[in-house]
Regions:
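Sec/Tat signal peptide C-region and signal peptidase I cleavage site
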Residues: 41-45
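Charged (often Lys/Glu-rich) extended helix/loop segments that serve as interaction or gating elements
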Residues: 46-183
């Protein structure tokens, strides 16, 4: 360095000179230094840390560090480890020229620009400090992208990397790059990359590629005249990646969609697919968040079907559509509005075209729209409801229930006397009801009025610390605008006035604590009994069935049971409920429920459904089945529930249910659902179509990893009917994800008799942080 060399030469000369010579030479050197310092033409100096440039920019102070600096007029020159800083920008190079008037930096040799999450390297560059605009040649750069985890998006910590012959920085977040390739893979040997003669990178928005192509292992596989890929969270409008696939029932599948996001709070997707063997489908999704707390989602899926050909028979058309709408919003005054609508043309359409087994086997269609407001212990609701349950698909039979409109008001228990333990509550509603069914043709004309008022008085009593008795008294008055007579609707009003008594008895709770090491266990036994008495229903068969309120019957019963809980506490953490086991049964003093029970057929009453959802009453009986509900939750790796119904009158199990979630090792998982029921026989015989005396089905999924986990991921699943001895659904999914991309393959089979017997083959290529290409979309779940 010039300064260092100068100081070394001066010291050597002084060692061999006389004092007078030294003084003269020192004076001469000082004069020369003074002349250099005051000369306006040029100036030299050692690298001075954080030396401000002479002209300050409008946005603040720019500083420069270098091994050597000099000034020639308005131009500053710096060489060797040059470091220019301005606001959040840092420019490094071997040589820099800075024009103090135009505030332009011209850099050469090992140019590096760092700005927030941007890192750009180039051979040379021209950069404007004031505007942030610049041009770089022979560029390499990385831009960090933050993506939130999504079920269908592979996430990689790698930044977006690009190389280009030239990059124009248009502003702090926009780059126009030429003859470039981009990837999120490691730059040494990228698995994939986009090549484009021209591309525009808008940070936190998108990357737009013009006349480019997608390359896999440097081999072009897809030409892209114009493509947009997302960068971070912002959405961009445009055409989606085409869908390609093949199934045994649809044939070859070719489809595409267009995505439109005109506003930050609204977007829409419209698409269509051609099925070579069947016809074509249409789909659409609309999402909107118009204001805070409001959600609006709408979707449509339809198929125009040429028909399914089976064994040379004439084509059977299974086309139709399903449209869904969901709207939720908080309104002024504490009101909440909800509309959850579902319109389905037929059960056959759902069975034939649903993407997952869970959707296909759902035979219910529910619609609800309501306004609700909770205030001061009261709840006020206005609703319109619809429920349709398909019993068979071919021929199609169903039961339809509608309520429109309905107003309901209720209250929680409230004490009107400060010194007396007496609490009052009530429930009241009025509305119009409709019922229609195809099995035994029946339909109410229009809507039938139904109103109810039910005040309740509750008196909690405590006898020391060992016994609590809580009696409740309810008077329920219900009016129906019509009634049933011999299975025929009669347009004649009818009142149902009932007196109801409930006595809840809570006995002493037994508990014991076991201590061993760092883990403490607590065993709790909670016995209980509830007595119920209902009188006044009388002729149960006259009342129309619109919902569970209409299945109220006379009863005189006692329910008794015991709940055992095992708690576990490790160290100083909170106690967790490890095991819960509930045993319960009912004894009926009135085995005919006031004459409502019809022998020889399943009877569905409110008091029976409250115990178990599996019908068991086809004759007069005193004892109900014993219901056992065992739940084991030892931690995050294991969760299971066993439900068993044992009928002592028939001396056999009538229902067995198992739900299991288990993670035996690291990312491995097992999910299982099994239900076996013995349905009551129907009278008269023979039973109706599709009736099964015995039902025994199992569904299971097991595997390792998930769709977006790095490495190998495998999922296997099946649904098997033991009675029909047939698989209804099978799935095999294998995927491998690297640091920047992944590939997945899937096989699915649906078997629904003559309606659908289909093999599906799907493939997907996942591009980390950007999206995916292929027709493997949704992962199967059991619960």
């Amino acid at each position: 360095m010039l300064g260092s060399v100068f100081f070394f030469c001066t010291s050597e000369a002084m060692r061999n000179a006389t004092l007078s010579n030294s003084v003269r030479r020192l004076a001469l050197y000082c004069a020369l230094l003074w002349l250099l310092a005051v000369t306006p033409g040029t100036s030299w100096g050692q690298g001075t840390p954080q030396k401000p440039l002479v002209g300050l920019t409008a946005g603040g102070e720019a500083t420069l560090e270098a091994d050597q600096q000099r000034q020639a007029g308005k131009i500053f020159y710096a060489d060797g480890h040059v470091d220019v800083r301005y606001q959040n920008a840092r420019l490094q190079a071997d040589h820099v020229q800075y024009d103090n008037e135009s505030q332009v930096v011209i850099a050469q040799g090992h140019v590096v620009l760092d700005y927030n999450t941007q890192h750009v390297e180039a051979d040379d560059a021209r950069y404007e400090l004031r505007t942030g605009r610049g041009t770089f040649h022979h560029v390499r750069g990385t831009f960090a992208m933050q993506r939130h985890p999504m079920p269908t998006l592979l996430i990689s910590p790698n930044p977006l990397y690009f190389e280009a012959e030239q990059a124009d920085r248009l502003d702090e977040n926009t780059y126009r790059i030429h003859k470039a390739w981009l990837t999120v893979c490691k730059p040494g040997r990228p698995t994939w990359k986009f090549y484009a003669p021209a591309a525009t990178v808008r940070l936190k928005q998108s990357v737009r590629i013009e006349n480019g192509n997608f390359r896999l292992y440097s081999i072009p596989v897809l030409y892209l005249p114009f493509a947009t890929v997302p960068a971070e969270q912002r959405r961009d409008s445009g055409f989606m990646v085409p869908d390609l696939g093949n199934t045994s029932q649809k044939g070859y599948v070719l489809g595409d969609s267009v995505y439109w996001a005109p506003l930050d709070w609204m977007d829409m997707t419209l698409g269509a697919s051609d099925y070579s063997k069947r016809g074509w489908s249409q789909k659409g999704d609309f999402r909107m968040r118009p204001w805070e707390g409001a959600v609006f989602n709408a979707s449509y899926y339809g198929v125009i079907d040429r028909g399914l050909v089976v064994d040379g028979e004439p084509p059977v058309k299974q086309g139709g559509h399903e449209a869904k709408l969901l709207f939720t919003s908080m309104l002024p005054g504490g009101w909440r509005a909800v509309a959850d609508l579902d319109q389905l043309t037929s059960l056959t359409f759902r069975l034939a075209w649903s993407e997952t087994f869970k959707e296909a086997v759902n035979s219910e269609v529910r619609n609800s729209a309501f306004l609700t407001n909770n205030f001061d212990g009261f709840s006020l609701n206005f609703a319109a409801l619809s429920y349709q349950n398909y019993l068979t698909a071919a021929p199609q039979t169903s039961i339809t229930l509608r309520t429109a409109p309905e107003a309901r008001i209720s209250s929680v228990d409230q004490a009107f006397f400060s010194r007396l333990p007496i609490y009052f509550s009530f429930d009241a509603f009025t509305g119009g009801e409709h019922r229609g069914e195809d099995v035994t043709p029946f339909e109410t004309p229009g809507f039938v009025g139904r109103s109810e008022f039910a005040p309740t008085v509750t008196i909690p009593l405590h006898f020391g610390q060992w016994l609590s008795v809580t009696p409740s008294f309810t008077f329920r008055s219900t009016y129906y605008g019509g009634q049933l007579r011999s299975g025929t609707f009669l347009d004649q009003g009818l009142f149902r006035d009932t007196e109801e008594l409930s006595v809840d008895i809570r006995m002493p709770v037994f508990e014991r604590v076991y201590e061993g090491g760092a883990t403490k266990w607590k065993h709790v036994i909670e016995p209980y009994a509830v007595y119920r008495y209902v009188n006044g229903v009388n002729d149960f068969g006259r009342f129309l069935r619109f919902d569970e309120d209409d299945t109220l019957t006379d009863t005189n019963e006692i329910e008794y049971g015991v709940t055992q809980r095992l708690y576990r506490r490790t160290g100083s953490g909170d106690a967790e409920e490890f095991i819960t086991w509930r045993l319960t049964q009912k004894y009926f003093f009135d085995p005919t429920f006031g004459g409502a029970l019809v022998p020889g057929q399943p009877n569905v009453f409110q008091t029976l459904d409250a115990l178990t959802p599996f019908a068991f009453a086809d004759e007069a009986r005193r004892f109900s089945p014993i219901v056992s509900d065992l739940t084991i939750e030892p931690g995050k790796r294991f969760d299971t529930q066993f439900i068993v119904n044992y009928d002592p009158q028939r001396n056999r199990l009538t229902a067995i249910g198992t739900l299991l979630k288990y993670k035996p090792y690291k990312e491995s998982f097992i999910t299982l659902a099994h239900f076996s029921t013995l349905n009551l026989p129907l009278n008269p015989s023979p039973p109706p179509p599709n009736f099964e005396q015995h039902s025994n089905q199992i569904r299971t999924l097991f595997g390792y990893g998930d769709q977006n986990r790095r490495g190998w991921n495998v999922t296997l699943g099946a649904s098997y009917d033991f009675v029909q001895q047939a698989f209804q659904n099978q799935i095999v999914e294998v995927a491998y994800n690297g640091s920047c991309c992944g590939v997945g393959f899937e096989y699915r089979r649906f078997s629904f008799g003559t309606i659908r017997n289909e093999n599906q083959y799907s493939v997907v290529f996942r591009i980390a942080n950007l999206g995916s290409a292929g027709n493997l979309r949704r992962q199967e779940k059991i619960f």
